[in-house]
């Protein structure tokens, strides 16, 4: 008798996705982050659902409702900090996943890669609107500053900003719609993730060598299910350590002050995972130029497959490209640090140099060095 998992219409899909899926035998732990992102998404949706049961999206009660969750709801503090630090874990996994894709040439599966970029944008949008919900000082001013960037769009900018605000400033209407967006977006992300997986399984997984592995596949279960469970245990350990010992380590103290439109915080800055893009935005003195650079810093990922000049897919056997890749990582860490610093000397010039280097590495140096490597290998 044929196993039910291979005949039942629903079980068959799950079987082909997580059990009998042919997987390259040599994929490393860098391939764990996809499943960890799925775990993060499920966890964020569940903790978010329980938070939404007690939260009120109204300017007069939002801040106190979050305090009520932390003080009066059973394990409310735990759910709230799991959700806040879960977002940080989500972005750590997301950036590692993208870094893996860049290093090993996974972007050559273009449909999967482009859906991935869409997913990144959706997660960033979700995190941004979610940060506004506690209605602290940084929530309010972060929302004001970032939405105001749209006013740089010629002709329709101001109208667009007021349309998003639902008035002439960030107020009750803004908070209510941001809560609605924050609630719906994770479900859109879930649907996109399913499409991401669908495209991935059309082309098969890449592997560290970048060479097709059709002749050497193993079933996903039990080999990679056990490997993913180990990764999940590490993720949960890190998240629980962060949540139970230093829950406010990655947050901003200003967000413990209720939103006040009459008092501006000394340094307005987003959460740590947006600081690199914020640094690029600030490094250009012109408003429209800054907004375009900010957009391009993320959307440049779409152009990565077109910039592939190497005849090898992976960087595994390309030491010069590896050097540039790690220079790019160092540059992104520098930008993250600069984004959290005040706008003064020497941070301004360091930020500008790091921003120029970011685009120069991706658009010029990496494709050029790939061509040189081809020549060295007489290709």
From Swiss-Prot:
Presence of the UniProt keyword Membrane in the record: yes
State what protein this is by name: Cytochrome b
The compartments listed are: Mitochondrion inner membrane
The protein's matches in SUPFAM superfamilies, at most eight in alphabetical order, are given as: a domain/subunit of cytochrome bc1 complex (Ubiquinol-cytochrome c reductase), Transmembrane di-heme cytochromes
Q: What does UniProt give as GO cellular component?
A: mitochondrial inner membrane; respiratory chain complex III
Q: Which organism is it from?
A: Sagmatias obscurus
Q: Decide whether keyword Membrane is in the record.
A: yes
Query: What are the GO BP annotations of this UniProt entry?
Result: mitochondrial electron transport, ubiquinol to cytochrome c
Q: What is its main location?
A: mitochondrion
Q: Which cofactor does it need?
A: heme b
Describe its partners and assembly state.
The cytochrome bc1 complex contains 11 subunits: 3 respiratory subunits (MT-CYB, CYC1 and UQCRFS1), 2 core proteins (UQCRC1 and UQCRC2) and 6 low-molecular weight proteins (UQCRH/QCR6, UQCRB/QCR7, UQCRQ/QCR8, UQCR10/QCR9, UQCR11/QCR10 and a cleavage product of UQCRFS1). This cytochrome bc1 complex then forms a dimer.
Q: Give the family from UniProt.
A: Belongs to the cytochrome b family.
Q: State the gene name recorded for this protein.
A: MT-CYB
**Regions crossing the membrane:** 33-53, 77-98, 113-133, 178-198, 226-246, 288-308, 320-340, 347-367
């Amino acid at each position: 008798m044929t196993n039910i998992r291979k005949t039942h219409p629903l079980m068959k899909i799950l079987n082909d996705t997580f059990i009998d899926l042919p997987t390259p035998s040599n994929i490393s732990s860098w391939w764990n982050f996809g499943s960890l992102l799925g775990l993060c998404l499920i966890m964020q949706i569940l903790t978010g659902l329980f938070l939404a049961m007690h939260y009120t999206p109204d300017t007069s009660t939002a801040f106190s409702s979050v305090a009520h969750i932390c003080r009066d709801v059973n394990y409310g503090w735990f759910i709230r900090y799991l959700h806040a630090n879960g977002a940080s874990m989500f972005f750590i996994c997301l950036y590692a996943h993208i870094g893996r894709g860049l290093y090993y040439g996974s972007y050559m599966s273009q449909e999967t890669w482009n859906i991935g970029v869409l997913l990144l944008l959706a997660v960033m949008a979700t995190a941004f609107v979610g940060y506004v919900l506690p209605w602290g000082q940084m929530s309010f001013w972060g929302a004001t500053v970032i939405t105001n960037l749209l006013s740089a769009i010629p002709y329709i900018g101001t109208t667009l900003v007021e349309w998003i605000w639902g008035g002439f400033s960030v107020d009750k209407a803004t908070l209510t719609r941001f809560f609605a967006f924050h609630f719906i977006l994770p479900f859109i992300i879930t649907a996109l993730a399913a499409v991401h997986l669908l495209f991935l399984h059309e082309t098969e997984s890449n592997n560290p060598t970048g060479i097709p592995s059709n002749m050497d596949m193993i079933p996903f279960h039990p080999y990679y299910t056990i490997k993913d469970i180990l990764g999940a245990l590490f993720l949960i350990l890190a998240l629980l350590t962060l949540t139970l010992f230093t829950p406010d380590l990655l947050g901003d103290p200003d967000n413990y002050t209720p939103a006040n439109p009459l008092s501006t915080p000394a340094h307005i800055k987003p959460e740590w995972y947006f600081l690199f893009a914020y640094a690029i935005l600030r490094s250009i003195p012109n408003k429209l130029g800054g907004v375009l650079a900010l957009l391009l810093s993320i959307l440049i990922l779409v152009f990565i497959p077109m910039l592939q000049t190497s005849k090898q897919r992976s960087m595994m056997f390309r030491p010069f490209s590896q050097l540039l890749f790690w220079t790019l990582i160092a540059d992104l860490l520098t930008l993250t640090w600069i984004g959290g610093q005040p706008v003064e000397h020497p941070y301004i010039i360091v930020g500008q140099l790091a921003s120029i280097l970011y685009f120069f590495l991706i658009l010029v140096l990496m494709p050029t060095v790939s061509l040189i490597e081809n020549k060295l290998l007489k290709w």
